[in-house]
């Protein structure tokens, strides 16, 4: 009996332990699943981030590579066009007839002189004929000033690009005078010649007659004084406004005063 009880108790204890173990196992399984899911999510996030980085980097490199290829192609095209233009400018095609009568085109390199001539303005290359265009010679310019002044004309001649100035011969004075007279005739009031203007006398108002003062009679004490008096009398008679009567009265008064003093 005791053995049965011990076995039953032992079996009961084992069953209880198993129940506890199973209970703990369920909780552990639940917790373990949650942790595993979280770990998987973290791993997935890390993997996706790495994939994004790995995908984006090659795209940038590809774009840079494409830009470099485009630049290289443009540069190569420009280089080819410049080389082709230089080769075409440096070379000329010539038609040569063979012995069989066939026309063959051959390329001939241009010289430095021909290149320079081709770059000059006004140069035309037509079927091997080089024509250099020179400007036409300009007409001689005449310089004239109005208002009575006539300057000498300066003739300018342009020959083969070199400018030469030649002074015109001096104009004689007679021609200059004739030109001045023509201008004066065209002006209003200038029909009279300067000689006629100089010949016209200038009229001024006649000045008023000026009466000369009568000189005082001198005392006569000798025959020479009488002769002087006679000359003075003649001169006084010729003067305008002289009256003999007044002069004689003055002379008589002077002699009368002189006599008593003697």
Swiss-Prot record:
Protein's UniProt name: Dehydrin COR410
Domain of life of the source: Eukaryota
Species of origin: Triticum aestivum
UniProt repeat feature Sequence, residue ranges: 106-126, 173-193, 225-245
Reported induction: In freezing-tolerant gramineae, by cold temperatures. Water-stress induces the expression to a similar extent in all species tested, abscisic acid (ABA) to a much lesser extent.
Gene Ontology cellular-component terms listed: membrane
Keyword Repeat found: yes
Tissues expressing the protein: Expressed in roots, crown and leaves during cold acclimation.
């Amino acid at each position: 009996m005791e053995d049965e009880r011990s076995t039953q108790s032992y079996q009961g204890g084992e069953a209880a332990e198993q129940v506890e173990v199973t209970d703990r196992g369920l909780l552990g399984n639940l917790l373990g699943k949650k942790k595993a899911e979280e770990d998987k999510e973290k791993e997935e996030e890390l993997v996706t981030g790495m994939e994004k980085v790995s995908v984006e980097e090659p795209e940038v490199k590809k774009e840079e590579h494409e830009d470099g290829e485009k630049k290289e192609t443009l540069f190569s095209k420009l280089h080819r066009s410049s080389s082709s233009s230089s080769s075409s400018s440096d070379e000329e095609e010539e038609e040569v007839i063979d012995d069989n009568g066939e026309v063959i085109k051959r390329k001939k390199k241009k010289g430095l002189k021909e290149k320079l001539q081709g770059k000059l303005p006004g140069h035309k290359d037509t079927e091997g004929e080089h024509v250099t265009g020179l400007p036409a010679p300009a007409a001689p310019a005449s310089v004239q000033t109005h208002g009575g002044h006539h300057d000498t004309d300066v003739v300018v001649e342009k020959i083969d690009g070199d400018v030469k100035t030649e002074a015109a011969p001096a104009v004689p004075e007679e021609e200059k005078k004739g030109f001045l007279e023509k201008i004066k005739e065209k002006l209003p009031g200038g029909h009279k010649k300067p000689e006629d203007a100089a010949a016209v006398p200038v009229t001024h108002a006649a000045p008023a007659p000026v009466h000369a003062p009568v000189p005082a009679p001198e005392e006569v004490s000798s025959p020479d004084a009488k002769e002087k008096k006679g000359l003075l009398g003649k001169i006084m008679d010729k003067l305008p406004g002289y009256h003999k009567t007044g002069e004689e009265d003055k002379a008589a008064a002077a002699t009368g005063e002189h006599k008593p003093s003697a």
